[in-house]
Amino acid sequence: NITKDHLDYHETFRKYKLSKLKILNFLKENGTFILDADNKLLNEMVNKKKFKSKNIIKITKDKTYNYVNDNDYLQGAHNASNCSLAVSIAKHLNITLEKIKFAIENFKGLPHRMEPIYISDRIKIINDSKSTNGESTAAALKSYKNIFWIAGGQPKSGGIGDAKNFLDRVIEVFLI
């Protein structure tokens, strides 16, 4: 994932992108690079880079989206994209579709990352306190409707960024 984050450490978005691409320097000639074809920025960056390996697999959001939505821990288009990448890697490693589906359906998520705290027919309480920038907050807000949003922490440059595009889904905001 390449988003405008960690600029406090990298200083500029350009330096951050270059830092992310350094991992590709370790890709061996017979190695495989799996690329999220839906990510325009990542595609632009990768197209400019020379690789030792010619084995590049481009993937898009595919059938994984159908069963991602059944898992309360994997809501949202960003998680569909993450699952698509994971499925592509698993297929490349010859893991059966049955095992892949089982793993996705039984994934319990990570603490503070769109973590379901309470779910009933009427209400969902989600802890997404790891969303510390506008882009990750936007991904969370885009995943739900009728939101009561509790926000806090230290402001980052760029404010709430892309999250402002999904404020129509928010009923009330509580700043702490």
Language-model segments: what does each one mean?
Residues D38, T60-T64, G109, I119:
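Residues that form or immediately flank small-molecule/cofactor binding pockets and catalytic motifs
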Residues D72-I171:
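Nucleotide phosphate-binding/pyrophosphate-handling subdomain across enzymes
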Residues F33-D38, I150-G152, R169-I176:
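Short internal beta-strands
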Residues I2-K4, L18-L24, N55-I59, H78, ...:
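Short, surface-exposed linear patches
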Residues M45-K50, N55-I59, V87, H92:
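Generic alpha-helical hydrophobic packing signal
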Residues I23-N30, K49-K52, S143-Y144, K164-I171:
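Short, conserved loop/helix-junction motifs that constitute active-site signature segments
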Residues K50-N66, G76, K101-E105, E115, ...:
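Beta-strand->loop->alpha-helix junctions that form or flank phosphate-binding loops
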Residues N1-K49, K63-L74:
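Flexible active-site lid/hinge loop adjacent to a nucleotide/diphosphate
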